């Protein structure tokens, strides 16, 4: 297995697919990286030369991926919570952040139902 940005990428898959195993690199970014490195998307990872791997690593080093990207995302969320913005409040309360309805659905974000007992009338 080749290691790129601290991640073992699968040897038997095409390079364009293997690069998506790195957090922060999707299909489009992987295609751009390979075009810049001059490597065919159809090449398997096991068939890459050390020179090609080195060029790919150099390009990925310029992109924010893995730990740096995760840290930036968490700091952005923390900043929203500290300044008291609406989005920050939604993050703090564990509710949907992007305007979705939460009366009936939003179970993924809210977690399992907590049944509240009825008051006697």
From Swiss-Prot:
Keyword terms, alphabetized: Ribonucleoprotein, Ribosomal protein, RNA-binding, rRNA-binding, tRNA-binding
Domain of life of the source: Bacteria
One Pfam family, short name: Ribosomal_S13
Gene Ontology cellular-component annotations: cytosol; small ribosomal subunit
GO BP terms: translation
Entry's Gene Ontology molecular function annotations: rRNA binding; structural constituent of ribosome; tRNA binding
Compositionally biased intervals (Basic residues): 106-121
UniProt region (Disordered), positions on chain: 91-121
Entries under InterPro entries matching the protein: Rbsml_uS13_C, Ribosomal_uS13, Ribosomal_uS13-like_H2TH, Ribosomal_uS13_bac-type, Ribosomal_uS13_CS
Known role: Located at the top of the head of the 30S subunit, it contacts several helices of the 16S rRNA. In the 70S ribosome it contacts the 23S rRNA (bridge B1a) and protein L5 of the 50S subunit (bridge B1b), connecting the 2 subunits; these bridges are implicated in subunit movement. Contacts the tRNAs in the A and P-sites.
Assembly and interaction partners: Part of the 30S ribosomal subunit. Forms a loose heterodimer with protein S19. Forms two bridges to the 50S subunit in the 70S ribosome.
The family this protein is said to belong to: Belongs to the universal ribosomal protein uS13 family.
PANTHER family: 30S RIBOSOMAL PROTEIN S13/40S RIBOSOMAL PROTEIN S18, SMALL RIBOSOMAL SUBUNIT PROTEIN US13M
Protein name as catalogued: Small ribosomal subunit protein uS13
Organism of derivation: Bacillus cytotoxicus (strain DSM 22905 / CIP 110041 / 391-98 / NVH 391-98)
